[in-house]
């Protein structure tokens, strides 16, 4: 698949359109065929100067994206291949006290696209 990545921090000229392996959805995950991804100020800042956490380079940004489900990992229910989805900027753990109380918007261990996980500047993302 193709992805837009950077190998060093800097201006937009550091972005490269590259071939990378297509991810496979793990248990409980889906493979999203990305159809749209915004250029977010957060992503621009990460590319230009990094963050408090070091990103493993090369890296794929894209904190906000949408698409359709291309494949289902084992155990996935409630969605079908072809369903259109919008991917929330953070992935809650679903195990902390807040997630268990239905307040996953304040999850204690949420992972964020573009920071802890490669983002949507790619043809496919496992989510």
Task: State what each model feature region is.
Residues 21-38, 50-97:
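Glycine-rich beta-strand-centered segment in the early N-terminal region that forms part
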Residues 33, 91-127:
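NAD(P)H dinucleotide-binding glycine-rich loop of Rossmann-like/cofactor-binding domains
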Residues 1-2:
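Extreme N-terminal starter segment of soluble prokaryotic enzymes
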Residues 16, 26, 81, 120-121:
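A generic structural signal for well-ordered coil/turn residues at beta-strand boundaries
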Residues 19-21, 126:
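Generic structural detector for well-ordered beta-strands
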